Amino acid sequence: MSTPVTRTQVPDGVRDRLPSEAAAMRRLSARLDNVFRAWGYREVSTPVIEYLEAVAAGAANWGRREDLYQFFDRKGRTLALRPDMTTPIARLMATRLADEPLPLRLSYFAPVFRHRELRAGATSEIWQAGVELVGAPGEAADAEVISLACAAVRAADLTGFRIGLGHVGVVEGLFESAGVDPQAAAVLKEAMVARDLVAFEQGVARAGLSGERAERLLALVHFHGSYAEAVARFGGVGGRVAEALQHLGRVLEVLEALGVAEQVNLDLGLVRSLGYYTGVVFEGYLPGIGAPVLGGGRYDNLVAEFGRPLAATGFALEVDRLLMAQEQQGALAAEPGLDAVIACPPGQEAAAMAWAARLRAQGLAVEVDFLDRTGEELAAYARARAAARVLRPGVPSIH
């Protein structure tokens, strides 16, 4: 049975933004855009609404179609609100950007939509800022996007940022070496995404794993350490695991040269909920925020879903979590006030508005009071609007 609603409510998982909140978001957007452009990333936008077949290219790997917002158009075709930006940009890369020289560096600032459990400040309308580096394989490209993620968080005047770094090949390789079947692997990955250690241990037991095979998998989900420790613990498995560890080592070498390695910790049990990742994966964290503020990684097979095989890597920042961190750390810039409020006595509307126009032409932010407030009432309104002064017709002031 549906829950009654009123016309003054908004749906679960979405919110209004008041002027100060919208201004804070716009300032953050400008800072991030400046950083992205300085690194050569150009902004693109894609439709909020896509055909289900298009977003399913990402969601199929994800296995979470029930989290999509789906509906029909007038021709009976199934549409969906985009659940992420990476999949639409992959479509764009394979179509309208097919003739662009590679690698392509693209950025975005946009909302995505997913049904999510509404806890810990989570919403279903998720504003993201991110980048995609397409057509560049290898550790240098992986290191660039990780380093850019660090630069973006610095641009937001936030401190204490850390990145957890993993690799799909380590997880998949350990599952293969332990003989985990695909169904059991899916259960284990779901537990890893949720960071549910109890569910993971139960999944290992149900899969019939014991001895060294079980110990390695349990060590995987608990591992947070240095590269040397990772090689010592898992390097002997060989195969995909050894290859993935070698790649991580080369990425860390580049990050060391870029001066950001101290912000990066190996988190080999890291699994991202979006299942199109094929190599390096990472998440970013800030003190006092109980969920990742950033996630990303390499997805070398996704663009091929749209007919154009291309290596790619990128990340997405969760804007509202960054804003929450800015508020906690006192990094939110004060909202700019007005330069003046102009009093507007009856019959002087045209003169007051013309005066305001002249001041705006000088670059000032000016508001005309149409409610005929006077004295302390007008002064109180000006204070509420953070106006530097009150101007009255016939009283000399700024011109």
From Swiss-Prot:
Matching Pfam families, A to Z? tRNA-synt_His
Q: Specify where it is mainly localized.
A: cytoplasm
**What are the protein's UniProt keywords?**
Amino-acid biosynthesis, Cytoplasm, Histidine biosynthesis
Q: Where in the cell is it found?
A: Cytoplasm
Q: In which pathway does it act?
A: Amino-acid biosynthesis; L-histidine biosynthesis; L-histidine from 5-phospho-alpha-D-ribose 1-diphosphate: step 1/9
Q: Give the UniProt entry's GO cellular component terms.
A: cytoplasm
State the SUPFAM superfamilies in the record.
Answer: Class II aaRS and biotin synthetases
The GO biological-process annotations, alphabetized, read as: histidyl-tRNA aminoacylation; L-histidine biosynthetic process
Does the keyword field hold Ribosomal protein? no
**Any coiled-coil ranges, and where?**
none
* InterPro entries with a match to the protein in the record: aa-tRNA-synth_II (IPR006195), aa-tRNA-synth_II/BPL/LPL (IPR045864), HisRS-like_core (IPR041715), HisRS/HisZ (IPR004516), HisZ (IPR004517)
Q: Which PROSITE patterns match?
A: AA_TRNA_LIGASE_II
Listed GO molecular functions? catalytic activity, acting on a protein; histidine-tRNA ligase activity; transferase activity
Cytoplasm among keywords = yes
Q: Its biological function?
A: Required for the first step of histidine biosynthesis. May allow the feedback regulation of ATP phosphoribosyltransferase activity by histidine.
Q: How does it assemble?
A: Heteromultimer composed of HisG and HisZ subunits.
The miscellaneous comment for this protein is: This function is generally fulfilled by the C-terminal part of HisG, which is missing in some bacteria such as this one.
Identify its protein family: Belongs to the class-II aminoacyl-tRNA synthetase family. HisZ subfamily.
Instruction: Tell me the protein's name.
Output: ATP phosphoribosyltransferase regulatory subunit
Q: Which species is this record about? A: Symbiobacterium thermophilum (strain DSM 24528 / JCM 14929 / IAM 14863 / T)
| Encoding gene (name) | hisZ
